A protein has these predicted regions:
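Short alpha-helical segments that sit at the start of domains
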Residues: 17-46
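Short helix-to-turn junction characteristic of helix-turn-helix DNA-binding domains
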Residues: 47-51
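Short acidic, hydrophobic short linear motifs in intrinsically disordered regions
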Residues: 53-66
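N-terminal leader/capping segments at the start of a protein or of a new domain
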Residues: 1-18
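A short, conserved structural fragment
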Residues: 84-94
Length: 127
């Protein structure tokens, strides 16, 4: 049976998103590195989703999973390269196929992402 989400609950989550974007996320350089664009957010969520689900993901897979309406393939790959330069992700060579390089978030990015999610889900304060 599906859980019914009330308008009040949606309002609460929306307020947490606003507070989170204006406080935690606005001052967290790790999260800011992904830009607050649609494709930047999708890149971040793809990386973190693959990490938490223990499913390796490549830059190409990320680029192919994001609709061209959000950003060009080149823009997506460049943002991933920037995240690597900023030491927010590392690339690990696949053991089964040396041509494949999987993207893995660093501890700093994992910490920032968990802080952001924890705040949005009302698990922690802004401080």
């Amino acid at each position: 049976m599906a859980k019914i989400i009330t308008q009040k609950r949606i309002a609460g989550y929306t307020l947490r998103l606003l507070e989170g974007y204006n406080s935690i996320m606005a001052y967290d350089d790790n999260i800011l590195s992904f830009k607050f664009s649609a494709y930047g957010t999708l890149i971040l969520f793809n990386i973190m989703n693959s990490y938490y689900n223990n499913k390796p993901i490549t830059s190409e897979e990320i680029a192919n999973s994001i609709d061209y309406k959000f950003g060009s393939r080149n823009s997506i790959l460049n943002l991933i390269k920037t995240a690597e330069k900023n030491k927010l992700i590392i690339r690990a060579v696949s053991k089964s196929d040396q041509r494949q390089k999987y993207i893995i978030p660093t501890k700093a990015l994992i910490h920032s992402h968990e802080k952001m999610i924890g705040f949005i889900l009302n698990l922690e304060d802004k401080s």
